[in-house]
Swiss-Prot record:
This is Phosphoribosyl-ATP pyrophosphatase. GO terms for cellular component: cytoplasm. It catalyses: 1-(5-phospho-beta-D-ribosyl)-ATP + H2O = 1-(5-phospho-beta-D-ribosyl)-5'-AMP + diphosphate + H(+). It comes from Caulobacter sp. (strain K31). InterPro entries: HisE, PRib-ATP_PPHydrolase-like. Keywords: Amino-acid biosynthesis, ATP-binding, Cytoplasm, Histidine biosynthesis, Hydrolase, Nucleotide-binding. It comes from the Bacteria. The keyword tRNA processing does not apply.
Length: 107
């Protein structure tokens, strides 16, 4: 297993432990309590990741990617979507052309 997957698995487990936590003392609990805020933060991190990719170099991209993945995990948890559900969606798309997969989606 990749080091990234191991770290993400531990991080996802830690995020789950923050559900129901005190939002005044835990940033993660604050985001988990407010899915709209979690979504906003994910959007901000996505933009910062794109900027790092085109203008700031590999180290900045790695750092912003870490922030992006953290905020994505929080949003998924805040929305009560399991990582297995996401994995199922990805698995269903394996071996399908991206263009064919997009064309098959409902509008």
């Amino acid at each position: 297993m990749s080091k990234l997957f191991e770290v993400l698995e531990r991080l996802a487990a830690t995020i789950e432990t923050r559900k129901g936590g005190d939002p005044t003392s835990s940033y993660t609990a604050k985001l988990l309590n407010d899915p709209a805020l979690a979504a906003k933060k994910l959007g901000e991190e996505a933009v910062e990741t794109v900027i790092a990719a085109v203008a700031q170099g590999p180290d900045a991209l790695a750092s912003e990617s870490a922030d992006l993945l953290y905020h994505w995990l929080v949003l998924v948890a805040a929305s009560d979507v399991s990582l297995d559900a996401v994995a199922d969606k990805l698995a269903a798309r394996e071996g399908t052309s991206g263009l064919a997969e997009k064309a098959a989606r409902p509008s």
